[in-house]
Amino acid sequence: TNQWYAIAKIAGIKLCQAYRRQHGNDFISAMPTNLYGPGDNYDLASSHVIPALIRKAHEAKASGASQMIIWGSGSPRREFLHADDCADALVHILKTYSEDQHINVGSGADLTILELAQLIADVVGFHGQIVHDLTKPDGTPRKLMSGDRLAALGWRPGISLREGLAGAYRDFLTGDARGNVA
């Protein structure tokens, strides 16, 4: 998301590599893509894109609104992975990978924020218009990781984006009991 976050991730990778080389431990750095799933944060002030869009679509549907507003142009592309798939991938990596280089954990597919908003609106059942707030930032044009190392190990995600979003929406609907919905 920002320069300092990226620097911290790189520092963590380098620390694992150095510790592995110095002490002979089988440390592996796994770099996950954007994750979503059960127990997510649906507070619009602090949530990431998927839970924010789920909440916006739900509130638009529940209030009978004719439109749902999304940030920016909708053109940036993002990759997403369900948290359960990430956990599965990490177990697979622990069983099949022992290299010095970090390994990316992702779906290998991306879509635009507008396509994501349309998919979420469909899953939620909101049939109104999606409107762009061009006063809000787009962010980086594209974030898609290379999943070649993980694919070579024979791992593929098991949860489609639509299926995962439907599960996330079910989680949102029951989340207020856990305090996840502000």
Model-derived regions, located:
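Aromatic/hydrophobic pocket-lining residues that form π-stacking "cages" and hydrophobic walls in ligand
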Residues: 16, 56, 117
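Active-site helix of classical SDR
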Residues: 4, 8-11
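Conserved beta-loop-beta element that borders a ligand/cofactor-binding pocket
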Residues: 13-38, 51-53, 62, 67-69
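C-terminal substrate-binding subdomain of Rossmann-fold SDR/epimerase-dehydratase oxidoreductases
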Residues: 59-182
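Active-site "substrate specificity/gating" loop of NAD(P)-dependent dehydrogenases
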Residues: 41, 45, 73
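Active-site loop-to-helix junction immediately N-terminal to the catalytic Tyr of the SDR YXXXK motif
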Residues: 2-4, 18, 44
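Short beta-loop-alpha junction of Rossmann-like oxidoreductase domains
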Residues: 38-41, 149
